[in-house]
């Protein structure tokens, strides 16, 4: 009588394979997390660039109109409801007053974001959208904190966002993953 052929793996072989798979998984997961954070940063930088382009387009339209100072309901841009600051930067839509504050109250920033980025991610004053908007710095700046990544931190501690200054027209990515605070 001969010996039977050996089918399958021994317990030791299975344990070795499981340990090796565990080591591979332990080294791969942090790299995947880093890739996710990098992808979110790239997405926010893209949204910031799109917002900046839209603000620059509105500013150019204001310059073509002769740089007339503060405008309510600027004709020739979008549906004609965009309001421009004294310096020619977007302030909001249908503000109804001639001050240089961004928008109407807390809704001003997300109304401006949603107007300029028609096909982009949405913003709101709460966490129900991809971006949560905040009006601050004397009501002349907006921060749009990226919430699609699950971040629940306050504006000043947010991981990622977009910062807009209606006095200078500057737009930048912000957050703890960048060098700029939101």
Task: Give residue ranges: language-model regions.
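N-terminal leader/signal peptides at the extreme start of proteins
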Residues: 1-9
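Short, contiguous, well-ordered secondary-structure segments
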Residues: 1-2, 19, 57
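Internal alpha-helical transmembrane segments of multi-pass membrane proteins, especially GPCRs
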Residues: 7, 13-16
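Alpha-helical hydrophobic helix detector
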Residues: 15-30
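Amphipathic alpha-helical protein-protein interaction surfaces
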Residues: 20, 37-40
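Phosphate-coordinating loops and pocket residues in cytosolic domains that bind phosphorylated ligands
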Residues: 34
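Membrane-proximal N-terminal amphipathic helix
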Residues: 39-69
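Periplasmic/extracellular, small/polar-rich flexible segments of pilin-like filament-forming proteins
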Residues: 63-182
């Amino acid at each position: 009588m001969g010996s039977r052929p050996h089918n399958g793996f021994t317990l030791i072989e299975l344990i070795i394979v499981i340990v090796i798979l565990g080591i591979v998984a332990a080294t791969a997961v942090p790299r995947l997390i880093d890739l996710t954070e990098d992808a979110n940063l790239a997405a926010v930088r893209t949204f910031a660039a799109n917002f900046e382009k839209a603000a620059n387009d509105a500013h150019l339209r204001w310059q073509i109109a002769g740089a007339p100072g503060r405008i309510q309901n600027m004709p020739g841009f979008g549906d004609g409801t965009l309001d421009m600051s004294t310096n020619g930067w977007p302030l909001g839509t249908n503000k109804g007053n001639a001050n240089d504050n961004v928008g109407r109250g807390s809704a001003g920033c997300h109304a401006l974001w949603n107007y300029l980025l028609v096909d982009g991610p949405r913003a709101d004053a709460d966490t129900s959208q991809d971006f949560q908007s905040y009006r601050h710095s004397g009501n002349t700046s907006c921060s749009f904190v990226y919430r699609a990544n699950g971040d629940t931190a306050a504006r000043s501690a947010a991981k990622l966002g977009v910062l807009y200054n209606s006095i200078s027209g500057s737009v930048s990515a912000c957050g703890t993953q960048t060098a700029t605070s939101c």
